Swiss-Prot record:
NCBIfam families hit by this protein: PRK10775.1
Cytoplasmic compartment spans: 1-28
Protein's organism: Yersinia pestis
Pfam families: FtsQ_DivIB_C (PF03799), POTRA_1 (PF08478)
Protein name, entry field: Cell division protein FtsQ
PROSITE patterns per record: POTRA
Length: 275
């Protein structure tokens, strides 16, 4: 066979191979497009299925954590305030968390979903340490919050008063004062700090102490030394002790009623003394 014939045959074979290669590539591209189309269509169907409110609705609620003031209905109403709950796939738990943490006695909430239809919520409530300005509470860190009064029951807490934003200062003062009084067998009931940082106390026997703005602890020590002598006064009960002096104190006496066994009218005595 001549060289020309051989060359022609080789060129024909190369053309046939090229056509087969192009056909294979085209078939591969078509197959890839079909696969991608199937995936996209399947994803669209799944997304539509997940968004369907009748598919995987969040129908179970589990609330955990130590609770003293929070009811299941509180949580349920907080969630419903956002509208109808979403499905397992569409509901944003961060929104629910923020909504629950709006309850003024909730310190922290964590929310998560559990397959297939459960919403789990863990709560951390504020723990009241004292009452603040009658309307609120503060915790051990001096953070102010509120609890519905009907849910507090008969819980007895210290009474603290002060300007807005002074919670931590008043709490720190209460702790320092209470430590000294408790060591001397006195029970502190109330602490108030005015806008001018003047301090007033009340003991559990309703004796009121005026400490003023300076030398708070020194004046408190003066009360501890003075009060036992005042208690020895016959037929008298201390109402208040004003310690806002460099030395001594001003004492107010409360009315005392004596048992009327001799037919005499009750004695209603009150006087001030300056030791």
């Amino acid at each position: 066979m001549s060289q020309a014939a051989l060359n022609a045959r080789e060129r024909a074979a190369e053309k046939n191979a090229a056509r087969r290669s192009n056909g294979s590539q085209l078939a591969g591209v078509i197959f890839l497009l079909m696969v991608l189309g199937t995936i996209l269509w399947g994803g669209w169907v799944v997304i539509g299925w997940m968004k369907d409110a009748n598919r995987l609705p969040l129908s179970k609620l589990v609330v955990t954590g130590e609770r003293h003031y929070t009811t299941n209905d509180d949580i349920r109403q907080a969630i419903l305030a956002l509208g109808a709950p979403g499905t397992f796939m569409t509901q944003d738990v961060n929104i629910i968390q923020q909504q629950i943490e709006r309850l003024p006695w909730i310190q922290q909430a964590s929310v998560r979903k559990q397959w297939p239809d459960e919403l789990k919520i863990h709560l951390v409530e504020y723990v009241p340490f004292a009452r603040w300005n009658d309307l609120h509470m503060i915790d051990e860190q001096g953070r102010s919050f509120s609890v519905p009064s009907e849910r507090m029951g008969k819980q007895v807490l210290p009474l603290l008063y002060g300007p807005e934003g002074s919670e931590r200062d008043v709490l720190e003062g209460y702790r320092a004062i209470n430590k000294v009084l408790a060591a001397n067998k006195y029970q502190l009931k109330m602490v108030a700090m005015s806008a001018r940082h003047s301090w007033q106390l009340a003991l559990d026997n309703d004796v009121r102490l005026e400490l003023g703005r300076s030398d708070r602890m020194g004046r408190l020590q003066r009360f501890i030394e003075l009060y036992p002598m005042l208690q020895q006064q016959p037929d008298k009960r201390v109402s208040y002790i004003d310690l806002r002096y460099d030395t001594g104190a001003s004492v107010g006496w409360a009315p005392v009623f004596i048992d009327n066994q001799g037919g005499e009218p009750p004695i209603n005595g009150q006087q001030n003394s300056n030791p």
